[in-house]
């Protein structure tokens, strides 16, 4: 702590040849820019409001088909085809994802006569093997019960 009873001169505390730095001059700032003049607001009736569009399933399929044909023909890139259809990329990929499972279900083909006969034969063999396995397991269980004296 500082000694309060010390009444020595302040000049004695500071070295006489110490480097004394002059306070640095403050930087001058340029004056602030004036605020931009606000543009007059347009009337609500003048600007057409962007209303959300709802497309039917048929319209979605048509737009997707149009985009695919443009891209496969090599006329334009995928991004350009999507923009020309008037939808966003996100919308395109969402539509593509929802339409694809429906098409995959429709593409499921039925087995032909020869394949059907093979399936029937395999199912019969599967049943026969299951019965054989069940008989073996029953015999093994009976043998273990006799050894353990449970029967």
UniProtKB/Swiss-Prot annotation:
SUPFAM superfamilies: Homeodomain-like. One of its GO terms (biological process) is DNA transposition. Residues 24-35 have a biased composition (Basic residues). Residues 1-61 are annotated as: Disordered. Residues 11-23 have a biased composition (Low complexity). One of its GO terms (molecular function) is DNA binding. InterPro entries: Homeodomain-like_sf, Transposase_8. Keywords: Nodulation, Plasmid, Repressor, Transcription, Transcription regulation. The keyword Repressor applies. The keyword Nucleotide-binding does not apply. Seems to affect the transcription of cya3. May be negatively autoregulated. Belongs to the SyrB family. This is Probable transcriptional regulator syrB2. The gene is syrB2.
């Amino acid at each position: 702590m500082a000694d309060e009873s010390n009444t020595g001169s302040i000049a004695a505390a500071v070295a006489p040849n110490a480097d004394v730095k002059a306070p640095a001059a403050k930087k001058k700032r340029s004056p602030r820019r004036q605020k931009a003049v606000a543009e007059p607001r347009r009337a609500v009736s003048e600007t057409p409001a962007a209303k959300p569009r709802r497309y039917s399933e048929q319209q979605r399929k048509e737009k997707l088909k149009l985009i695919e044909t443009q891209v496969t023909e090599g006329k334009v890139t995928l991004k350009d085809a999507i923009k020309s259809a008037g939808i966003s990329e996100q919308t395109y990929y969402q539509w593509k994802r929802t339409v694809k499972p429906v098409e995959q279900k429709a593409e499921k083909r039925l087995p032909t006569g020869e394949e059907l006969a093979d399936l029937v034969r395999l199912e019969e063999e599967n049943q026969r093997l299951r019965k054989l396995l069940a008989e073996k397991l029953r015999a093994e269980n009976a043998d273990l019960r006799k050894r353990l004296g449970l029967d």
